[in-house]
Amino acid sequence: MKLCFNEATTLENSNLKLDLELCEKHGYDYIEIRTMDKLPEYLKDHSLDDLAEYFQTHHIKPLALNALVFFNNRDEKGHNEIITEFKGMMETCKTLGVKYVVAVPLVTEQKIVKEEIKKSSVDVLTELSDIAEPYGVKIALEFVGHPQCTVNTFEQAYEIVNTVNRDNVGLVLDSFHFHAMGSNIESLKQADGKKIFIYHIDDTEDFPIGFLTDEDRVWPGQGAIDLDAHLSALKEIGFSDVVSVELFRPEYYKLTAEEAIQTAKKTTVDVVSKYFSM
């Protein structure tokens, strides 16, 4: 299992340049690049070609652009903006050699029936699949374990991906999101491991279903999530690609970037190495 760093983990105490240097120093294999803040900040003083050269001359490689946000159930203007943004991402992926784009479903106070959510998600993901295919890029749908997210359980996301039925459309499995809205471990055990593209590891304080927010995340192995169950299920269904550590805890943003990156690796390896060689 390869080790990846998700830049949310140092959102307020680092930048892309420093994340790369420290992840390279501490033996990470991949990085997920945040396209909404850290990449634009980097591009103020550097070019995409500079970034591509860094990846070509170092061990660490780009795993994913994170993320295409709120892709489904948009009005015409919103949909057109999503398509334009995604096409730009494809060019970035081509320049940098990025394998995946993470797609995050709409979060809204508006109540939308599940059938409408599914239809829109399937339609848009199919359109994105067509755009991504010539680039060799895959789309990883990340359900979000929050009541206001239109796709908030593993079961709902898996059904959408199965309906799309494209080799370049799969899932992000995030342990926090899986736990936060009570997704069923039996559903994961019955899933096709090839449909899971990226595994996000994290843990959480022990709040009830529906109350958890990203700030409640803690280092892997230090919270209430049954990570052993998640990892053993992933092993059972044949997933062994990449584990990406992703936290959003304000307390951890007070650490130095190096402390956070080192601790993220140690806690992740301690938990994952019981099931996978790293």
Swiss-Prot record:
Pfam families: AP_endonuc_2. Its EC number is 5.3.99.11. The keyword Isomerase applies. Its cofactor is Mn(2+); Fe(2+); Co(2+). Binds 1 divalent metal cation per subunit. Can use Mn(2+), Fe(2+) or Co(2+). Keywords: Cobalt, Iron, Isomerase, Manganese, Metal-binding. Pathway: Polyol metabolism; myo-inositol degradation into acetyl-CoA. It catalyses: scyllo-inosose = scyllo-inosine. Gene3D superfamilies: Divalent-metal-dependent TIM barrel enzymes (3.20.20.150). GO terms for molecular function: isomerase activity; metal ion binding. A divalent metal cation binds at residues 142, 174, 200, 246. Belongs to the IolI family. Involved in the reversible interconverion of 2-keto-myo-inositol (2KMI, inosose or 2,4,6/3,5-pentahydroxycyclohexanone) to 1-keto-D-chiro-inositol (1KDCI or 2,3,5/4,6-pentahydroxycyclohexanone). This is Inosose isomerase. The gene is iolI.
